[in-house]
Amino acid sequence: MIFPVLPFLVGSIVLSANTQNATEKNSTSASATESATTEKTSSSTDNKAPEQSKEPPHDPEGVKPPEGFQWKIWAKEPLVADPVAFTVLNDGSLMVVESERQDRGVEDNRYSPWWLMEDLRARTVEDRLAIYTKWASKRVNGMDWYTKYADRVKHVTDTKSGGVADTAVNFSGDLREPLDGTAAGVLQVGDSVFVTCIPNLWRFQDKDGDGVAEVREKMFTGFGVKTSLRGHDMHGLVLGMDGRLYWSIGDRGYNVRTKEGAVLQDAARGAVFRCELDGSNLEVVFRGLRNPQELAFNDLGDLFTVDNNSDGGDKARIEYLPDGGDVGWEMHYQTLEGANKRGPWDQEHEWFMFDPTDVVQPAWLTPPVAHLTDGPSGLVAYPGVGFPEKYNGAMFVCDFLGGDAYSQIWSFKLEPKGAGYEMKDAEVFLREVLPTDVDFGTDGCMWVTDWFDGWTSDGTGRLYRVWQPESFEKSKAAGGADILKKGFRGADTSDLLAWLDHADRRVRQGAHLELAARGGAAIDSLVALTHNFQTPERARLHGLWALGVVARKFGGTTTGDKACDELMQLAADPDSELKAQATRALGDSRCAKALDLLRAMTLDENPRARAYACAALGRLQDKEAIANLTAVLWENDNADPWLRQAATTALARIGDRAKLEVMAADQFPQVRLGALLALRQMRDPAIGRLLFDSEATIALEAARAIYDLNIESQMPMLAALGDRFCDH
């Protein structure tokens, strides 16, 4: 029987590599995280919940912000109840997602153990519906159980300018089909409101202005093939600097057909998706997540999430999400207990921080940036206005633990380190609140949704505003709220260019996306701005991002060529960050005439530029770059896991098996490992040749790949590998 071979080999190979010190690291992590570390009820109840308050609902005695900040209740039940997520519109009103289906329509395998094995086998949403139908007798009123309650999106407004909400309208209509839920993400872009509610990504539009959507379009369907744990749903809708829509899903998996006819499928892993606003070019950009809640871009246009722990002694993780990365979680790990608790997730240190001396942690995964929170939920990047300067560059994450006495909102900063990031300045920002989501209004105030109590839907909820008076006045003086309310479509080009240096990142982003949409009418102005060294760096950066959008959307035209030419100029800029960003944009826009430049950029002294160059060459499938990528692997020598990931993902996308086999025989182990990691992404049986590598860690990595991917042709060789470590 082959099944027990890999765990045995892991232990044997690790011992042969003398890894005692590596396996002892983080030895205190389990005891530090075995206490209640739970996800928000509207998203999950992964851990044992504290007892729900038996007292009637009451207003909190006081949310506790930092000294000098103020707060107020803006809305409460019945206007807002069971709030999961929200977005602040440019006119100052809110779209709030409510979920009344928690544990009464949105289910959880832990409380429905009878269908666990079937759920593990499910591959499509139709499979899940068949499971619900088969076991309908377990529910009160059978299948009606799944349609009695609804999730929805409410448009909540202060129509009387009284400083509190006074009106709430059911904007989306009820979402109550058996496969639905949790509705957990909402974002307005233009006249469209996008909503994530498994199994669908929705687009809603209110054409007649009555506050209710007449257009209800399922852009995509097929998300959430499994039940998994309650709350491991679709979240995190956010607009990228590239003008594309991004969102996340937990380990309920997906089986989705794109507009172009391709099928994206992974039944047991969470992921991050992106597509154009019209739904074209849907793709997976990151894999292997467990329960990522919201997504947030920082001021450099890099993407992050905070992913929850599994109650197995592991910790919640801040994850940097580079294109093609993989965290390593699989849904069935949650079911493993006893001596094999959480399987390789814990035993092979998959959730650990990167340590170059730890030969146990797999090289194929993308490690976390930091461990923070116990129940991560809503996430937002500070837009640059409304708070004191100490929060510039900060992110805020909700830490939901089932009661306001032990929940909070954290602030933290992320700074580039090598090709990745490191966390700085983590501190609790807001206490005495049970937060599900956090965002910033156009006026600079922070908004927070409060589930209020417990884990299940009970018809209560709050919406708070938090602000610092002096900084709030400065935010008003900056005028960003007026700009955002008026919109960008009718603005003069000169104003748009000036706004690229606005204090509010949302204004800068809106301006650069509008300039990009104008294409040829704005290209010369963008080139002049980015080419001028006297232009402030952040204005040049947003101008560069606009050029990247133009190069992508107008490729093959004179306008697109102009944008590509300027990006090539910027890739030689003395500003190291602009150089790195231009490199990324060239690959993202598939600018083929930049290939020579991109190959040269793999030697750049800035590791961010090197990583982006690798990613670009992979996107362009440049076979001539294999030597450059090999050099990156050799020089890096496994020191920077994010740079290694960029190079190996590029090699996999290029997909030249013959050259990878040559690399697999290279004299340098870091090159052989890089070839193996690329072959793993390709699911190529050629991995088998590395099972007997002289480096035990490479042999282990090959064994993992064959076992994890079930490469049947190599299973006999994997079994034979036991002879290398068995005593006879």
Q: Which functions belong to the PLM regions below?
A:
Residues 18-28, 46-50:
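Cleaved targeting-peptide boundary
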Residues 478-487, 506-519, 538-558, 565-572, ...:
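Structural detector for internal amphipathic alpha-helices that build alpha-solenoid repeat scaffolds
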